[in-house]
Amino acid sequence: MSHPAYELPIDVNQIQALIPHRYPFLLIDRVIELDLEAKRIVGQKNVSINEPFFQGHFPTRPVMPGVLIIEALAQAGGVMTQLGLGRDALSKLFYMVKVDNARFNKQVVPGDVLILEVQMKRLIRNMGCYYGEAKVNGEIVASAEIMCAAARE
């Protein structure tokens, strides 16, 4: 399937046409930069006090779970991969299979705008490898190397 040339920003409705994630697990609100030739994407997640995970993490001092920041990076990588391959949300699913060198440098709290910068390192057959950095106000709050693999049918 070929995609129309997306104009930036790519909004949440267009994102949902590309990846299968939905509320409450859709963790990217928009794409603000995309360079398929350079295999680079920049997404945005507006972190709201209304996020379901804040009910228990932690009620008196809400902090976005680090694993969800990594998931948000993976979803940004997924959007880029789907666009690069000309696929949509109904295509074969990719699953996160490995995370290396995850670092969490600062807490992400309600009101933060999480910027998701992802670079694809390689795509070989059914596996994609990415490096991602999540930033708030230009400061790296988390980073990781992520590997995803297409589901077997």
UniProtKB/Swiss-Prot annotation:
Cellular component GO terms held in the UniProt record: cytoplasm; membrane
Its localization reads: Cytoplasm
Quickly give the catalysed reaction. a (3R)-hydroxyacyl-[ACP] = a (2E)-enoyl-[ACP] + H2O
User: Molecular function terms in GO for this entry?
Assistant: (3R)-hydroxyacyl-[acyl-carrier-protein] dehydratase activity
Predominant cellular place of this UniProt entry's protein: cytoplasm
Q: Which UniProt keywords apply?
A: Cytoplasm, Lipid A biosynthesis, Lipid biosynthesis, Lipid metabolism, Lyase
What is one Gene Ontology biological process annotated in the Swiss-Prot or TrEMBL record? Answer: lipid A biosynthetic process
Q: Which residues form a coiled coil?
A: none
Documented EC number(s): 4.2.1.59
Q: What does this protein do?
A: Involved in unsaturated fatty acids biosynthesis. Catalyzes the dehydration of short chain beta-hydroxyacyl-ACPs and long chain saturated and unsaturated beta-hydroxyacyl-ACPs.
NCBIfam families per record: fabZ, PRK00006.1
Name of the protein in its database record: 3-hydroxyacyl-[acyl-carrier-protein] dehydratase FabZ
Species source reads: Xanthomonas oryzae pv. oryzae (strain KACC10331 / KXO85)
Q: What is the lineage of its organism?
A: Bacteria, Pseudomonadati, Pseudomonadota, Gammaproteobacteria, Lysobacterales
